[in-house]
């Protein structure tokens, strides 16, 4: 992603990262389901879907450009879902002059409003749906809440949205905040921990994932394992690369060292990242930018390695 809501209105929320690197997503906690998913059941009434053995697959979707529902069209040979978690990219953290406020651009809002066709069908298949949140060039972000109360206020806004639209979780991304803009404070070491703790209290049983980048990443890397253990997943944020996050309280079963941009990472690189994920025993495999339409040859190149099965598009 490489823009906040200002850019998000035109761009949808997440593009290539600054400095030429293309950015990826985040991470997990407690008991896991048959798909390797953490605690809590998907919202809705999923059908009895065939299971698979292997890493939990993440699919970020730029809803400014593509349909979230497309995630559910990929199936393995035995009928299992190719992807386990679909992430709406992305809502924003705006600044209203006195505090951080959650903002959805028109495309994110349309996806939420059209839950009957964009979200519920995925959940009925056992695919969890999360909302990603990142900065919007207004000075507010997940790393600079000045007090615990401020973090709790924002967490309550997020929790209300998760509840209202029947979502399965939230994804945190420390990009495009432009800390200091509009007189906002600089990042601090406590902010991200306050937010994660407040979210875990507000949305028990829901997913909380972390796109491992920015000042929040630095703070988490030196934080108590008590904070990290409240996350469900974390992942490498640089597409086409392989590097696991280092967050106390999160073991490799809840991490993705791989980061794949489906529209930009060469297929051979995606295959190599899948092979390394399996060989090293990481429990999560993160992808970003799944487009509309059928890209099953690309998806299959990864699922054959991760699950020993090709993926088809239905």
From Swiss-Prot:
It is found in: Secreted. Its main location: secreted. InterPro entries: Endo-Fsp (IPR016289), Endoglyc_H (IPR054861), Glyco_hydro18_cat (IPR001223), Glyco_hydro_18_chit_AS (IPR001579), Glycoside_hydrolase_SF (IPR017853). Residues 14-54 are annotated as: Disordered. Changing residue 174 to E/N: Reduced catalytic activity toward hybrid type oligosaccharides. Residues 1-47 form the signal peptide. The record marks 174 as: Important for substrate specificity. The keyword Nucleotide-binding does not apply. Residues 55-309 form the GH18 domain. Changing residue 60 to A: Reduced catalytic activity. It catalyses: an N(4)-(oligosaccharide-(1->3)-[oligosaccharide-(1->6)]-beta-D-Man-(1->4)-beta-D-GlcNAc-(1->4)-alpha-D-GlcNAc)-L-asparaginyl-[protein] + H2O = an oligosaccharide-(1->3)-[oligosaccharide-(1->6)]-beta-D-Man-(1->4)-D-GlcNAc + N(4)-(N-acetyl-beta-D-glucosaminyl)-L-asparaginyl-[protein]. Pfam families: Glyco_hydro_18. The keyword Magnesium does not apply. It comes from the Bacteria. Changing residue 175 to A: Loss of catalytic activity. GO terms for cellular component: extracellular region. One of its GO terms (biological process) is carbohydrate metabolic process. The active site is at 175 (proton donor). One of its GO terms (molecular function) is mannosyl-glycoprotein endo-beta-N-acetylglucosaminidase activity. Monomer. Belongs to the glycosyl hydrolase 18 family. This is Endo-beta-N-acetylglucosaminidase.
């Amino acid at each position: 992603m490489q823009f906040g809501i200002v850019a998000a209105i035109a761009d949808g929320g997440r593009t290539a990262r600054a400095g030429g690197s293309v950015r990826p997503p985040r991470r997990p906690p407690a008991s896991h389901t048959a798909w390797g998913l953490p605690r809590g059941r998907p919202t809705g009434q999923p059908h009895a879907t065939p299971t698979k053995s292997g890493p939990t697959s993440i699919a970020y979707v730029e809803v400014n450009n593509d349909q979230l529902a497309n995630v559910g069209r990929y199936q393995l040979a035995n009928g299992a879902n190719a992807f386990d978690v679909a992430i709406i990219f992305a809502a924003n953290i705006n600044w209203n002059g006195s505090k951080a406020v959650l903002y959805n651009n028109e495309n994110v809002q349309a996806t939420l409003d059209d839950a009957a066709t964009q979200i519920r069908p995925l959940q009925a298949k056992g695919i969890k749906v999360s909302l990603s949140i990142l900065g919007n060039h207004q000075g507010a972000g997940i790393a600079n809440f000045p007090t615990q109360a401020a973090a709790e206020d924002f967490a309550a806004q997020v929790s209300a949205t998760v509840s209202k639209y029947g979502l399965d979780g939230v994804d945190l991304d420390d990009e495009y905040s432009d800390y200091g803009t509009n007189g906002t404070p600089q990042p601090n070491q406590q902010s991200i921990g306050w937010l994660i703790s407040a979210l875990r209290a507000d949305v028990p049983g829901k997913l909380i994932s972390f796109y491992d980048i920015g000042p929040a990443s630095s703070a988490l890397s030196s934080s108590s394992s008590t904070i990290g253990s409240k996350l469900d997943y974390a992942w490498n944020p640089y597409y086409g690369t392989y590097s696991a996050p280092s967050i106390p309280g999160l073991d490799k079963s809840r991490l993705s060292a791989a980061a794949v941009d489906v529209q930009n990472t060469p297929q051979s690189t995606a295959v190599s990242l899948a092979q390394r994920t399996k060989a090293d025993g990481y429990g999560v495999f993160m992808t970003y930018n799944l487009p509309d339409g059928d890209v099953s040859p690309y998806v299959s190149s990864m699922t054959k390695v991760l699950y020993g099965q090709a993926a088809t598009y239905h």
